[in-house]
């Protein structure tokens, strides 16, 4: 760059900073602009790896969608539990009025510390979200769900009234307001969404999500969660096998998948994932039905190996960190593991 251009650019930058404040424009190499992405673990080792950065990125909008009973709320409650283990504050905007507090506690959520709101209208839900984000004191907000964000005009109208595009306009306006503040306050905002079918689609995928297209554009990460099978113990169904596909990812390559078990009353089976991923990474050895680690047998069959890791959390954490290192994903902080152990002991 010539001296004249350099001088003109410096004058323009000085004018912008004077008008809009320090930090309104900066070079990418100045440090602040090139900070590493801070993440919150999903509670699933496989999903953390599939996301490429070790979890869900803070200061971003995330959308989780899927069919009914696929594990959407369970996954978000696991993320809240992981955040709370690190001392973070979370809020749950329960627009569906369906949060099971006892189930949340079973998943490891510190319920007394969780902020909860059950708004009457979509506008109220998004105003509360905006106020919480602007406070700068909240680390994570979950909105459950976009489909339940009913505009005030629809609630006050008659049952058969047709109000096309009202919810989409509401979401579009809210996201325009929220996105900048979310980035500035480093708050993770998760929108849970439902699936609908497009009528008359002959080719391609007939599925779509509610609330218009704005959320698809503003989301940095979109996760498609599906139940793909049942987990049985003898003849009793004890959980679901779940697949999550990273449909959109602005912080890492997209279209990766994670498959994990969700056990009823327990949530994501972290021990089961450690065993499966440990075998794939050749950190855990499998010979027939026996699993072994560092030459020592840890169980015959997956259920026994899972139980061994549950009883020996320090070995589970050691295997997990070795898996993360082998795949170049951030290691789990010791604090999170210690708090998880303390919670297991209390139970």
From Swiss-Prot:
GO MF annotation list: ATP binding; ATP hydrolysis activity; ATP-dependent DNA damage sensor activity; damaged DNA binding; single-stranded DNA binding
Main location: cytoplasm
Keyword field contains DNA damage: yes
The keyword Amino-acid biosynthesis appears for this protein: no
InterPro entries: AAA+_ATPase (IPR003593), DNA_recomb/repair_RecA (IPR013765), DNA_recomb/repair_RecA_CS (IPR020584), P-loop_NTPase (IPR027417), RecA-like_C (IPR049261), RecA-like_N (IPR049428), RecA_ATP-bd (IPR020588), RecA_C_sf (IPR023400)
Alphabetized UniProt keyword annotations: ATP-binding, Cytoplasm, DNA damage, DNA recombination, DNA repair, DNA-binding, Nucleotide-binding, SOS response
NCBIfam families to which the protein is assigned, alphabetical: tigrfam_recA
PANTHER family attached to this UniProt entry: MITOCHONDRIAL DNA REPAIR PROTEIN RECA HOMOLOG-RELATED (PTHR45900:SF1), RECA (PTHR45900)
Function, in words: Can catalyze the hydrolysis of ATP in the presence of single-stranded DNA, the ATP-dependent uptake of single-stranded DNA by duplex DNA, and the ATP-dependent hybridization of homologous single-stranded DNAs. It interacts with LexA causing its activation and leading to its autocatalytic cleavage.
Family, per entry: Belongs to the RecA family.
Listed name of the protein: Protein RecA
Organism: Burkholderia cenocepacia (strain ATCC BAA-245 / DSM 16553 / LMG 16656 / NCTC 13227 / J2315 / CF5610) (Burkholderia cepacia (strain J2315))
């Amino acid at each position: 760059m010539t001296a004249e251009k350099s001088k003109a650019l410096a004058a323009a930058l000085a004018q912008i900073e004077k008008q809009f404040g320090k930090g309104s424009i900066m070079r990418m190499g100045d440090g602040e602009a090139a900070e590493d992405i801070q993440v919150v673990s999903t509670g699933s080792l496989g999903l953390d790896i599939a996301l490429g950065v070790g979890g869900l990125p803070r200061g971003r909008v995330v959308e989780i969608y899927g069919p009914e009973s696929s594990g959407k709320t369970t996954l978000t409650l696991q993320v809240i539990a992981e955040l709370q283990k690190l001392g973070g504050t979370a809020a749950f905007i329960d627009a569906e009025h369906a949060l099971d507090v006892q189930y949340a506690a079973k998943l490891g959520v510190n319920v007394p510390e969780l902020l909860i709101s059950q708004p009457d209208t979509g506008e109220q839900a998004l105003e509360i979200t905006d106020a919480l984000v602007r406070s700068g004191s909240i680390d994570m907000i979950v909105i459950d769900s976009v489909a339940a964000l009913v505009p005030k005009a629809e609630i006050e109208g008659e049952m058969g009234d047709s109000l096309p595009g009202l919810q989409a306009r509401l979401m579009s306006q809210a996201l325009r307001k929220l996105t900048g503040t979310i980035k500035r306050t480093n708050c993770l905002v998760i929108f849970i969404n439902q699936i609908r079918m497009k009528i008359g689609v002959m080719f391609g995928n007939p599925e779509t999500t509610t609330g218009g297209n704005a959320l698809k554009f503003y989301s940095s990460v979109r996760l498609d969660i599906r139940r793909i099978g049942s987990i049985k113990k003898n003849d009793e169904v004890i959980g679901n096998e779940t697949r999550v596909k990273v449909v959109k990812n602005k912080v890492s390559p997209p279209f990766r998948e994670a498959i994990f078990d969700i056990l009823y009353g327990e949530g994501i089976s972290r021990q089961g994932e450690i065993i499966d991923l440990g075998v794939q990474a050749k950190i855990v050895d499998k010979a027939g039905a026996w699993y072994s680690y560092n030459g020592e047998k840890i169980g015959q069959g997956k259920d026994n190996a899972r139980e061994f890791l549950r009883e020996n959390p320090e070995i589970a954490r050691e295997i997990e960190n070795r898996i993360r290192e082998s795949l170049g994903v951030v290691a789990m902080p010791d604090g999170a593991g210690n708090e998880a152990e303390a919670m297991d002991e209390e139970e």
